[in-house]
């Protein structure tokens, strides 16, 4: 925001150099990007060359049709002859003259000259030459009351120092001259007048006789106020107003529009002026746009609106995109005589969405989207009416139409001085804290040990005690807070059991040859279809992201597998033939509350060969048993026992997958070969890929807190092989589990080394060849002991799973 220093000085006395002011603003959180000198070079010696002149006579140049020879009184003993090319120069007008020796805004030095044979001792200035406009058709005409020879700088801001300020999003109150002046007053400890007024006369007609106002969308328009000014004359703005508008970075239009822009910059409240004659039905309605409704805005563009956009309409059509830009149909023209003046407060998020959707940003929308003070509207309307009467004439209809939500009482925050010193590391006097808050516009009431602070309506960012403490520290000055070293605290940090378990899982999987990856926690809504999940599968109920970065990241993941498959697909696309990856991350599930449930899971994926061919041996092909072996290796490293049973996951290959359970039978995940149709969806066709995904919290929770030591036996094992005939559909794990139970403590291990299905076993049966290893910790087992235990085990499995010994 551009803030002319002379304009700021109308609200606050700036008694320090502008460079120091810029530095102090920056140190308190309001960055001044640069201090620019605009207009005429501003030293006093140069300004003395710019004087008021009276054109006494004008005659046609003898040798140029477009030039005039003027006799101009500039307050000297004798008038000067000045050649001028402006079409509006004539005898009797008051003008601005630069005398020879004066330096123009562009650096040109004015000299005595001869123009087509006629001597010219100076130059009569236009608004463009003064820096008030980009271009102007003629010279500037000044009020006749100004005296010849007076300095123009005594009447107009010829030279201006402009602060270009970067205002933070939480401080919309500083997007105005008055708001920035209040901040300067607080920083420099000079008086600031909070209570100001702009009195003006009223007419005889009541405003409700001219127009009515309805608000159909109070959620988008909490307050809408209107006044009517009748009988105005639209004309060019006076030079002083053009100068102010131009120095603030805006373009002068006409007196009526320039008044609204002046108020916007002065107070920070956007206003909009309608041509009352163009308001159909003399009715103003703040409503949502109709779907597909169109409006031609002031820039000549036809805007197509949506039903979530707010418009200001009359009885027949939309006239304004609220808070963004007015429409061509109701704009102020040279023929306008009656003006409807709007002062409103609109929903910031709504204005931001509309501005983004339409691709339009304006000074008004910039302020609305940050959240404005609704109590500022009456003051802004008063100021605008006063200026309208002064510059445009007319009368103000009596009263204000003001439609608003119920007024909210001021926010009251308790502030503890002791807490201020504790957080800031200071020992500030209580009186200084009170003074700082009062200078910021707060009402401070001393309640003994605490303050009750009433926050002004223009500071919506002050919600909690810590916000007030920040303000105290900011205005006191961060540089004034003494530096202190943090206290030394002995002792070492440590890891929680969960962190230790996670680190161990990572180490085990890295040790197994896998690389850790981190994938996005977001995905699109089609990932569950690509995984062929059942319509009733709870994992389809993904949490939608409120503000997604893109359409393909609109849902929180409920599984790690999609991210692992996408990573594998990208690696295969770069001709990486062996992918061994794992991830430990969170999945997100609907909870019925504000936030979703989060679960930590560990998953891995192996695609391509598990081990490549070498000169000495053939490679190992990736299959289900690679994934199962990795899962068992992980469990063994954690000291956890796991069981496996057939799985029915549709994204896994049928017959080559398993549900993973803890010793109590509680499911903690799955392992298996990825279905070929799923691999096609992720550009992995032609590859074999296996994966597993486990509940990391449950898995780590099964880990014993204290590892149990088991002494190594010095006695030899006794091994025996046997073949059992069982039902073809019986999981081998059930046979192994039954043998383990029956074998007791002397059975050291059970390994399956062969599976046979053929003519040598009955139909519907299969043969499992198992190697049993027996060992005692305190003696050598005899053959009789082992045979006896083996017989007991055969009887047990025959009873529990229907197994018979194959002979």
Regions found by a protein language model. Give the residues of each.
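Phosphate-backbone binding interfaces of nucleic-acid-interacting proteins
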Residues: 1-205, 340, 359, 363, ...
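A carboxyl-terminal module marker
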Residues: 2, 439-442, 452, 519, ...
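Glycine/proline-enriched, intrinsically flexible loops and inter-domain linkers
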Residues: 5, 22-24, 28, 40, ...
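Conserved mixed alpha/beta core segments that line enzyme active sites in large multi-domain catalysts
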Residues: 51-82, 243, 247, 260-331
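Mobile "lid/hinge" segments at catalytic clefts and subdomain interfaces of large enzymes
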Residues: 116-141, 151-161, 310-408, 552, ...
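Extended, well-folded interaction surfaces typified by the phenylalanyl-tRNA synthetase beta subunit core
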Residues: 179, 413-579, 773-775, 781, ...
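Terminal amphipathic helices with adjacent charged low-complexity linkers/tails
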Residues: 188-216, 392-420, 426-427, 468
């Amino acid at each position: 925001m551009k803030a002319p220093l002379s304009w700021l000085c109308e609200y606050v006395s700036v008694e320090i150099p502008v460079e120091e002011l810029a530095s102090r603003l920056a140190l308190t959180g309001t960055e001044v990007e640069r201090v620019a000198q605009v207009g005429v070079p501003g030293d006093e010696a140069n300004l003395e060359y710019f004087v008021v002149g009276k054109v006494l006579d004008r005659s046609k140049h003898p040798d140029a049709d477009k030039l005039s020879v003027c006799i101009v009184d500039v307050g000297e003993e004798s008038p000067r002859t000045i050649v001028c090319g402006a079409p509006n120069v004539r005898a009797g007008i008051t003008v601005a003259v630069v005398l020879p020796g004066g330096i123009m805004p562009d650096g040109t030095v004015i000299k005595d000259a001869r123009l087509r044979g006629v001597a010219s001792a100076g130059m009569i200035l236009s608004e463009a030459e003064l820096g008030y406009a980009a271009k102007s058709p003629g010279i500037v005409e000044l009020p006749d009351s100004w005296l010849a020879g007076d300095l123009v700088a005594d009447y107009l801001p010829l030279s201006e120092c402009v602060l270009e300020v970067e205002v933070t999003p939480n401080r919309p109150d500083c997007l105005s001259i008055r708001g920035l002046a209040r901040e300067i007053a607080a920083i420099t400890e000079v008086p600031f007048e909070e209570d100001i007024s702009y009195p003006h006369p009223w007419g005889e007609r009541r405003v409700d006789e001219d127009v009515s106002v309805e608000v159909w969308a109070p959620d988008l328009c909490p307050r809408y106020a209107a006044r009517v000014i009748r009988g105005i004359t639209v004309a060019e703005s006076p030079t002083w107003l053009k100068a102010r508008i131009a120095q603030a970075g805006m373009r002068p239009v006409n007196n009526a529009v320039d008044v609204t822009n002046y108020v916007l910059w002065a107070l920070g409240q956007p206003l909009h002026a309608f041509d009352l004659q163009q308001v159909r039905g003399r009715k103003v309605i703040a409503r949502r746009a109709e779907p597909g409704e169109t409006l031609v805005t002031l820039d000549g563009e036809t805007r197509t609106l949506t039903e979530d956009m707010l418009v200001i309409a009359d009885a027949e059509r939309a006239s304004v995109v609220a808070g963004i830009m007015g429409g061509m149909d109701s704009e102020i023209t040279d023929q306008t005589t009656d003006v409807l003046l709007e002062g409103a407060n609109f929903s910031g998020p709504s204005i931001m969405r509309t501005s983004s959707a339409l691709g339009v940003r304006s000074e008004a929308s910039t302020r609305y989207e940050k959240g404005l003070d609704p109590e500022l509207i009456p003051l802004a309307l008063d100021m605008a009416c006063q200026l309208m009467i002064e510059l445009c004439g007319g009368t103000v209809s009596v009263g204000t139409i003001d439609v608003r939500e119920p007024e909210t009482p001021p926010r009251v925050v308790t502030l503890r001085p002791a807490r201020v010193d504790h957080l800031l590391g200071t020992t500030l006097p209580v009186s200084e804290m009170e003074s700082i808050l009062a200078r910021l516009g707060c009402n401070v009431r001393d309640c003994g040990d605490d303050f009750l602070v009433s926050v002004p309506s223009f500071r919506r960012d002050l919600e909690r005690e810590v916000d007030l403490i920040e303000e105290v520290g900011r205005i006191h000055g961060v540089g004034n807070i003494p530096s202190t070293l943090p206290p030394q605290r002995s002792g070492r940090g440590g890891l929680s059991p969960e962190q230790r378990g996670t680190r161990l899982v990572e180490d085990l999987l890295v040790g197994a040859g896998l690389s850790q990856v981190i994938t996005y926690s977001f995905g699109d809504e089609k990932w569950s279809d690509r995984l062929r999940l059942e319509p009733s599968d709870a994992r389809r109920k993904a949490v939608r992201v409120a503000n997604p970065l893109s359409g393909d990241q609109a849902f929180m993941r409920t599984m790690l597998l999609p991210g692992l498959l996408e990573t594998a697909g990208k690696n295969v696309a770069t001709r990486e033939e062996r992918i061994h990856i794992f991830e430990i991350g969170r999945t997100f599930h609907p909870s019925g509350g504000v936030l979703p449930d989060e679960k930590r899971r560990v998953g891995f994926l192996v695609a391509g060969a598990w081990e490549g061919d070498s000169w000495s041996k053939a490679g190992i092909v990736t299959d289900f048993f690679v994934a199962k072996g990795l899962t068992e290796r992980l469990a063994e490293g954690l000291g956890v026992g796991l069981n496996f049973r057939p799985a029915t996951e549709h994204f896994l290959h049928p017959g080559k997958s398993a549900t993973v359970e803890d010793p109590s039978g509680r499911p903690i995940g799955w392992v298996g070969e990825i279905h070929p149709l799923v691999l096609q969806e992720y550009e992995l066709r032609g590859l074999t890929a296996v994966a597993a995904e486990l509940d990391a919290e449950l898995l780590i929770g099964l880990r014993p807190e204290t590892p149990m030591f088991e002494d190594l036996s010095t006695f030899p094992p006794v091994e025996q092989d046997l073949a059992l005939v069982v039902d073809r559909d019986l999981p081998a794990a059930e046979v192994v589990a039954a043998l383990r139970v029956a074998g007791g403590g002397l059975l050291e291990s059970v390994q399956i080394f062969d599976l046979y299905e053929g003519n040598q076993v009955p139909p519907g049966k299969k043969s499992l060849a198992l190697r049993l290893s027996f060992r005692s910790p305190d003696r050598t087992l005899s053959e009789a002991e082992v045979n006896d235990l083996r017989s007991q085990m055969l009887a047990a499995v025959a009873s529990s799973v229907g197994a018979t010994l194959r002979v």
